[in-house]
Amino acid sequence: MSSKEEHMLEALQLAKRGLLTSSPNPMVGCVITHNNKVIGRGWHERSGENHAEINAIEDVFSNLGNKSKEALKESELFVNLEPCTTFGKTPPCADSISEYGIKKVYFGNEDKAQQGFSKMHPGIEVESGLLEEEGRKLNRGFFSRIEKGRPYISCKIASAL
């Protein structure tokens, strides 16, 4: 497993922390690295509150203090879902990523509800599809709502002979 996949796997693990609290939003986790060392972590804790990317950036400031802005300019961000580009209950994460000059963003899944991160912020290097299948599985309810306009439905049947 490559270091990129390890960082994305950690982001997916962080995302799972929002299982019971992030709805109706998807479960999202984020890891920020500098020289391949993790300097910030975050996840989307509750609807209407900071998204995973913002929590991870705040964690960088908590960990590095006055060295944070310089470190962020040389950093890579790993997030399981494409950063948001629209203003809802919170400002767009894409704007903060751009503002701090993060050099590269890796995300697992595209968010069809957004306007396209790479189109909105062309100066940032982007790589998508990292552990895409794992991310789709984690947020299958969200993707069903966005792509099919209906909830994800599973059915269990038990029978006795």
Positions of PLM-derived features:
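Zinc-dependent deaminase
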Residues: M1-T21, N35-V38, L64-K69, K73, ...
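A structural motif shared across PLP-dependent enzymes of the aminotransferase-like
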Residues: L20-S23, M27, G48-H51
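A short, conserved beta-strand element enriched in hydrophobic/aromatic residues
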Residues: V38-R46
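Short beta-strand scaffold segments in enzyme catalytic cores
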Residues: M27-N36
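Local cysteine-cluster metal-coordination motifs and their immediate loop/turn environment
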Residues: W43, N50, I54, L77-S98, ...
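Residue-level recognition of the N-termini of beta-strands and the immediately preceding loop/turn
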Residues: V28, K73-E76
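Generic beta-structure capping elements
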Residues: D59, N80, A158-A160
